[in-house]
Amino acid sequence: MSIFFSNPPWWGGKESRKGWFKRKRWRRGIRAGSRWPFTSLNKSRPDKRHIKDYTPYPYFLGYATTYAQRKIGKNHVFFRDSIGLSESYKSYFNFLDTIKNKIEYFLLESATPSWEHDYKLIKEIKGKYPHFKIIIAGSIGSVPEKLQHCKEIHAILKGEYEKNTLKVLNGEKGIIDYDLLTLDEMNQSPTPYFDDLHFDKYFDWNPVPMSKYFPQAHIWGSRGCPFKCIFCVWPASMTGNDPDGDKKRTVRQYTKEYMKNFIGTLIEKYKYQTIFFDDDTFNIGNKHTVDMCEIMNEFKIPWFAMCRADSIRKETWKIMHDSGCQGVKIGVESGNQYVVDKIVNKHLDLNYTKEIVQYIKSLGMSVHGTFTYGLPGETKANMLETKKYISEVKFTTVQESGTAEIEGAPLYNLNKKDLSVYPAAKIDSEYTRHADGSKKWMDLVESLQNK
């Protein structure tokens, strides 16, 4: 048996954006590695990668690759991140031609924003290589009824897919239900896939000054998040099974020993200049956070992390700084406390967040604040309050996006049922459903400008 773990190309057409730039640029999709797959106009173009276009590491795909390699042998497992490579469709199919006789199973991770594109590609792949058994993973697997008419699909995997991939390789097909790694299994599993072709293909601009360091290693120190934000996809559909937000969610953290060996190997082999912990929430609890700081203090390179404002003691931020952390991303979502509590269900005190952001900055670290607009039940006035909050807090940098509605997250189910965990979330005439947060944001910008 043999399997190809693929993150295929995802290109749109060439466009220009009024008020931004006149030269047409390619619309490029980001799929595996992104919690909310989206498209945007990039400097990259087919077969010509721009080194500083945002590109995340495809985490689930990378872990599943090495897990399969351990079980069935490296010679029977293939990996290719065509988005990281900025590969054209022509080059992608040329590569498939070189391995077609070695491949039995073909795995693609997908989600609603990319599914229309991906299914067309799957039909083309199946037409050219009819012996391929197509496996679909990713958040799209949480709603298998959307895929059951697709005769080209051999198996649909729910959740993170190391163990479920092996079930298919051992003969199972159809819908494969959740089977997550236990904490012990996770810490005994191999580290994710890196090689000489892909190691320098991942990049993020923020938090500053991360963009000045290259190459960047994007990694996880944990899986999952105990919080239940309405729009968050992975904790609800990949590292857990909680589409309505009414079940207990947990975080599984990698051990200090696992992470020390992992990071040490990456730095030694690929000479990474910085580490970005792209966890759902890196700093859940002081012990794990301090453990990671002790590791990074040994390696003496700058690092960055995806954090929450209130999940560690105040003094732990200084420990992070002293171990080389130069910046963090903090999800705030809205500048209106009612929206944060009753729609998002984040329960993050905005006044405390303002205080902690100023403290983090006083240490010499940057803070990249992330906000979302167009939540169900959110008013235009609420959105303008978010704008005001951003101006008052003075984050180093800010990310503003439209709220993406992607399968697996509670937001996706809101139009089907009332969800008690999100009492103020409602589908009304003000709410716009959209799976691509980038495109939704551009529509909202025009709307807010007219207020």
Briefly describe each language-model feature range:
Residues 2-262, 269:
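Acidic, low-complexity intrinsically disordered segments
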Residues 2-55, 218, 366, 381-451:
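C-terminal accessory regions of radical SAM enzymes
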Residues 61, 118, 165, 259, ...:
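Aromatic/hydrophobic pocket-lining residues that form the small-molecule binding cavity
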Residues 83-84, 140, 280-285, 308-309, ...:
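Short, solvent-exposed turn/loop segments enriched in Gly/Ser/Thr/Pro and often Arg
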Residues 84-87, 335-345, 357-382, 402-407, ...:
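Conserved strand-turn element in the central/C-terminal portion of the radical SAM core barrel
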Residues 145-151, 316, 377-391:
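Catalytic cores of alpha/beta
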